[in-house]
Curated annotation (Swiss-Prot):
One Pfam entry name: ASFV_360
Keywords carried by this UniProt record: ANK repeat
Name listed for the protein in its UniProt record: Protein MGF 360-12L
InterPro entries attached to this UniProt entry: ASFV_MGF360 (IPR002595)
UniProt keyword RNA-binding, yes or no: no
Annotated family: Belongs to the asfivirus MGF 360 family.
Keyword Iron-sulfur carried by entry: no
Length: 349
């Protein structure tokens, strides 16, 4: 659709920062959403308003406007360049569907188009976007057109560490349940605080899932929030095992260690998952089960070589025993393992 002169004027106006005494102009031009001005970031191509502080790209903003049956914004965003076909994933009334048709939308979307829109919409990892994706795709009949395996592959790829090493996600779950867990996991992985609180308040039966995601994705901030403030608990050794699933998870491993988890068990789990940095970090914290873990490293020559050497000792510069996530993040941000350095400088000849 070619933009009219009026829509171009609105786009320019939305890119400016007007004083409050000129807000009436924005209301007159329908540049008003969630009782506040609509702004358009021309560099990032993002629509922002009070209810969507993180911003939404044009196509996603259109999806939201269609879901809300906001006819003025549907027309505006389409004139600004949004693909009206994206609106078909969230249309919920015949009147809005008719408007989409008038603006050039297809009668229906095929499997490839639905999957592409799903992938595009989930690209931006912001609270506003993830919550919207959950609302749009939850129990969405359009997803019945998409091959179930293709949808599950899209979900499983970003959560592959959890898929491989826990039984908390599997093919027995309905697609709707998998999507809910997926959106929640993405919120935790990227520490999207508003989205985390949205899911936490609405889906209390997934509290353990939240804690698991925080441990696996090394989000020590939400781990602390969930454990200390929201009182979400798991077996401590299981918490440590989940923290060891993914390599470089120093912050969540250390958090569990301070709580009292067994560091030798953490070393064992790290070796089982072939996570070398985690393994060296456990050595720094005092893990010393080298001979006991040799059979576990069977078939992985590098780990067997590391464990066979008698050159390791706990770090002489102990870390502060504190569960404050700010302190943990600060101390471990640029952490270099003493025992890893010892191994790398050792002459293996």
């Amino acid at each position: 659709m070619l933009p009219s002169l009026q829509s171009l004027t609105k786009k320019v106006l939305a890119g400016q920062c007007l004083p409050t005494d000129q807000y009436y102009l924005l209301k007159c031009y329908d540049l008003w959403w969630y009782d506040s001005p609509i702004t358009f970031d021309h560099n990032l191509g993002l629509i922002k308003s009070a209810g969507i502080k993180d911003g939404l790209d044009l196509n996603t903003a259109l999806v939201k406007a269609v879901r809300e049956n906001n006819y003025n914004l549907i027309k505006l965003f389409t004139e600004w360049g949004a693909d009206i076909n994206y609106g078909l994933v969230s249309v919920n009334t015949e009147h809005t569907r008719d408007l989409c048709r008038e603006l050039g939308a297809k009668e229906t979307l095929n499997e490839e188009e639905i999957l592409r829109i799903f992938i595009d919409l989930k690209f931006y990892k912001t609270s506003s976007n993830i919550i919207l994706c959950h609302e749009v795709f939850s129990n969405n009949p359009l997803l019945q057109k998409v091959n179930n395996l293709k949808m599950r592959i899209e979900i499983f790829w970003e959560l592959r560490e959890l898929i491989k090493k826990t039984d908390l996600l599997n093919n027995e779950f309905s697609l709707n349940t998998l999507l809910l867990k997926y959106w929640y996991a993405i919120a935790v992985r990227y520490n999207l605080k508003e989205a985390i609180q949205y899911f936490y308040q609405k889906y209390t039966h997934l509290n353990t899932w939240r804690l698991t995601c925080a441990l696996c994705f090394n989000n020590v901030f939400d781990l602390h929030e969930a454990y200390e403030k929201d009182k979400i608990y798991m077996d401590l050794e299981e918490m440590m095992r989940v923290a060891c699933i993914k390599d470089h998870n120093l912050s969540t491993i250390y958090y569990c260690y301070v709580l009292g988890a067994n560091i030798n068990q953490a070393m064992l789990a790290s070796i089982q998952y072939y996570n070398i940095e985690n393994m060296f970090f456990c050595m720094d914290l005092g893990a010393d089960v080298f001979e006991e873990n040799m059979p576990v490293g069977e078939g992985y020559e590098l780990i067997r070589n590391i464990l066979s050497l008698k050159i390791y000792s706990p770090s002489t510069a102990p870390l502060p025993k504190n569960t404050d996530p700010e302190i943990i993040d600060h101390v471990l941000k640029n952490y270099k393992s003493k025992n890893m350095m010892t191994f790398l400088s050792y002459d293996l000849r």
